[in-house]
Structures are given as C-alpha cells and as structure tokens.
Amino acid sequence: EEMRLLKQSIPEDLPCGIIHGDLYPDNVIGKSGEVLALLDFEEICIESFAMDLVTTYVGFGWKDGLPVPELWNALLAGYESVRPLTDAEHAALPDLHRFAVLAVAAWRYWQFVIHVPGTEHTNRYVEMMKRLDKTLPF
C-alpha cells in the first residue's frame, strides 16, 4: 500500500531515460577508486534518472545501518557535474529513496524468504526496512 501511495506522490514528468536500475557495489568493478566496468544490466529500463541516482545511494551510501551524508554529497556532486537535477527531482528525492528502499526490501523478502528460504540471507530485507526510519541528507 505504501509503495502505491509513494508512486502516486512522485511526479510522473520527472526527466526519464535509460537507467541501469541496479548500481550496487557488487555490480561495479573498480580499482584504485576508478570504475572499470558496470555489470548486471538485467534491470535496465526507462525510468526517472533521479530514481537511478537514489537507488545507487541505497547501494553505496549507507554504512552500519546509517546514511552517510558525505557519500550522498559526493554522488550528487559527481552526478550534477554532468546533469544537474531539476527542482522537481530535488523535491522528489525523499519519496524516490523511500520507494527504492521498499522495492529492495520486497525483492530481498521474495528472494530470501519465499524463493530460496533458510539461507544466511533470510533476514536481509530487515536491513532495508530499518532504513525507513533514518534521517536522510536530502
């Protein structure tokens, strides 16, 4: 229900295009701080660019269960050096982030509780659910 309400609150006219959709550390090969390759393009789709940005932050911007503002600031600065966010995108960031966290939690629940239960990953969705109550740097 919350995802449906969030989807309604996120403007439909945010700038869109082809996005990766799954930029997490395990999908990036790097060396000495340089990105050498991106992997796992099975989630590629046409979606808002800001959704890809916050999804990347979900993957890279948290440490020990807390958001790391410096990582958000670096990610945003790098992103905006190429394409500045619109005012509407900036305003939508909290809802986009919440939507992305819920989507990851739902996927992890399906994958590790329903599809392949009983592994060491069974409670990985809980990590995402705990993020919903944290204060974000945007």
Where are the language model's segments positioned?
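An alpha-helical support segment within catalytic cores of ATP-dependent transferases
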Residues: 1-21, 84
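Active-site beta-strand-loop-beta-strand hairpin of nuclease catalytic cores
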Residues: 32-36
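Activation of the activation-loop gatekeeper triad in protein kinase-fold domains
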Residues: 39-44
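Active-site activation/catalytic loop segments of kinase-like enzymes and analogous catalytic loops
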Residues: 50-84, 99-116
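All-alpha amphipathic helical-bundle segments outside canonical DNA-binding/catalytic cores
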Residues: 85-97
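ATP/Mg2+ or Mg2+-diphosphate-binding catalytic cores
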Residues: 104-138
